[in-house]
Amino acid sequence: VDACAAHIVRNPSQFDVIVTTNMFGDILSDLATELSGSLGLAGSLNAGDNYAMAQAQHGSATDIAGQNIANPISLILSSAMLLNWLGKKRKVENLVLASNLIDKSVTKLLENQTCLTKDLGGTSSTAETTKNLINILKHLI
């Protein structure tokens, strides 16, 4: 795992999927996510042959619970990953399309650097960021 961590830092684009234990996967995914700028930017999906579970990559963040300052992007992208998995698993193209639209909305929000949460250098709340993402999504539909 130590060599893998070094390679992630040096050349993260060489990786697509890493198969490892839960503990090492948690460590490596946190490392990779921090390279993007924040734990709040990565989606997380645990998927098997028949079941999948989406969750925020950063965990529950109980230290900021109820303060309206958490970055919602991780959970939103996790939900998009679940829609994509379900769409492909059940051959429902609209679910895959919805996933792609959510991804595009997040990309636009980050490109415009509007309505960012504190972890990304902004001042927006969780609710404000989510509302802005919804508005972007509405314009893409």
Question: Where do the model's predicted regions map?
Answer:
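Short acidic loop-to-helix transition motifs that present clustered carboxylates
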Residues: 1-6
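Glycine-rich phosphate/pyrophosphate-binding loop and the adjoining helix
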Residues: 92-97, 101-141
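Glycine-rich phosphate/nucleotide-binding loop
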Residues: 7-112
